Amino acid sequence: EKTVATRQKSVRAAAERQLTVTDSFLTGSYRRQTLISPLKQADVDIVIVLDSSYKSRGPRAVLDLVRQSLIEEYKKGTKISRNGQAVTITFTDFIVDVVAAFPRPWWAWDSSGLDICDSGRDRWITTNPKRHVEISARANRAHDGQLVPRIKQLKAWNRNAGDPLHSFHLEALAWSIFGTSWWWYNSQASDWAGARYFFKRAYDKLSTPLADPAGTGKDIAAYLHGDALQAARSMARTAFERCDRAQKALKEDDPATMHEAYRRVFGDCYTG
């Protein structure tokens, strides 16, 4: 954690030396406390909000500018590449994604959000990472601190299954299934057995759009379609069946079968 704190400050300072930055902050799963180890397999996300004068260059050119600016700072020895919606810095111990953003105009329907670069389609897309952090914290409080550990368990399943879901999609799906406020939620404990409910609901929910809970109007699940969608649903169904098998084994006083079933779902993260 100390390494991440030091590194993210260094990256933000590097960007600020090269560009006119009006704000910068840590975001993503690290900020929402849902990052799972090992850190080397994860991304740490940083948003840099740039002066509006850069925006006329267009999304792809803005990311190229950020990339070149960071190359000037880090020189040789560090891989820095444009990667979809971010500039990716590959350090030896973990990866940092630098997301270039611009404030939404005051008259926009979501003026508290940010426009970020989608270099693949050379377009701007709207997001609101600070609101995502607020939603995550509120949801975790509603579940008496048990939702963040639950999401980490689900991310362990996702990694063990070959990452069929994007990390944030998985989190938003968990918010949708378990609820995000004290007056509407499905109470959860962070035991392994409780994940069974998620997989049961996810099988159906994965086949429908999932609106960004921050109110940006974006479908978080839009990337998932065709064979990839069917594979993700199949994996959720398999995980449900294995969790169900584990619960039946527990009732039959067969701990060995229970542990094996959970281990097949959660991989090395299962500590039972």
Where is each model-derived feature located?
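Generic non-transmembrane alpha-helical segments
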Residues: 10-20, 65, 69-73, 156-157
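Short beta-strand
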Residues: 28, 78-82, 167
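Short, solvent-exposed beta-alpha or beta-beta edge segments that form flexible loop/patches at the rim
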Residues: 24-34
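Helical scaffold of the NTase/Pol beta-like nucleotidyltransferase catalytic core
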Residues: 1-25, 150
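Conserved catalytic core of two-metal-ion nucleotidyltransferases
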Residues: 63-113
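Acidic/Ser/Thr-rich, low-complexity mid-to-C-terminal regulatory regions of eukaryotic proteins
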Residues: 99-145
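Conserved nucleotidyltransferase catalytic core and NTase-mimicking acidic/glycine-rich helix/loop elements
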Residues: 146-264
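Catalytic metal-binding acidic patch
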Residues: 33-67
